[in-house]
From Swiss-Prot:
Location in the cell: Cytoplasm
Deletion phenotype: Cells lacking KdpD and KdpE show an increase in virulence in mouse model of infection, with significantly shorter survival times.
GO biological process, one term: regulation of DNA-templated transcription
Chief localization: cytoplasm
In-chain residues carrying the UniProt-annotated modification 4-aspartylphosphate: 52
Maturation and modification: Phosphorylated by KdpD.
Gene name of the record: kdpE
Disulfide bond annotation, renumbered to this chain: none
Protein name, UniProt field: Transcriptional regulatory protein KdpE
Keywords: Cytoplasm, DNA-binding, Phosphoprotein, Transcription, Transcription regulation, Two-component regulatory system
Domain Response regulatory: 3-116
Length: 226
């Protein structure tokens, strides 16, 4: 269950958000002061934070700075301040979104869902171990395991696999891949890619002639699918 920390000194805002979030399956904790918010976050690290800037004991920007020292969860600022400078300051301090009061609940909840999705996707992409049904890529250990044994890869093969794996599910252009693995001087040497991808498929795919994980996007580049 997604844990939401709501920080606001207006009781009616706290109540409205608690009710609307709870009925949609979120777990909610609230705080009406900056000090209380930092204490609550330390005791129960939230998955997402909703933060008002106008708190009675300290600036919401200071609260944001305190949270950003250790918390990577998305922070949505909810404030009556409409000046562009306030928005810029909050976003520069680490806020992920800025919603002005008064606000529509449906739009706000949509922004909340989007922030949670982005954070979840980013966390998944940062996972150091990627498992497929054919092999496992350990990005931190810089190795690949297949059928219980480590697969020997050359530094170039590993460089190509690593870049594709770190961008899994996304198209990686041929020029981008060449510059990253071989260097800018090789940006047009596309035949290198065909040779090394074929080698990777032979070593990793169960059926190299019908690959499931190391895919070619004709004329564009390559994609890794777990």
């Amino acid at each position: 269950m997604t844990l939401v920390l709501v920080i606001d000194d207006e009781p009616q805002i706290l109540r409205a958000l608690r009710i609307n979030l709870t009925v949609r399956g979120y777990q909610v904790i609230t705080a009406s002061t900056g000090a209380g918010a930092l204490r609550a976050a330390a005791e129960h690290p939230p998955d997402v934070v909703i933060l008002d800037l106008g708190l009675p004991d300290m600036s919401g920007i200071d609260v944001l700075g305190g949270l950003r020292g250790w918390l990577t969860a998305p922070v949505i600022v909810l404030s009556a301040r409409t000046d562009s400078s306030d928005k810029v300051q909050a976003l520069d301090a680490g806020a992920d979104d800025y919603v002005t009061k008064p606000f529509g609940m449906d739009e706000f909840l949509a922004r909340l869902r989007a922030a949670v999705r982005r954070n979840t996707a980013a966390a998944e992409l940062e996972q150091p171990v990627i498992e497929t049904d054919s092999f496992t890529v350990d990005l931190a250990g810089k190795k690949v395991i297949k059928d219980g044994a480590e697969v020997h890869l050359t530094p170039t093969e590993w460089g190509m696999l690593e870049m594709l794996a770190r961008n899994r599910g996304k198209l990686v252009g041929r020029g981008e891949l060449l510059k990253e693995v071989w260097g800018p001087a090789y940006a047009t040497e596309t035949h290198y890619l065909r040779v090394y991808l074929a080698q990777l498929r032979r070593k990793l795919e169960d059926d190299p002639s019908h690959p499931k994980h190391l895919l070619t996007e004709s004329g564009m580049g390559y994609r890794f699918e777990a």
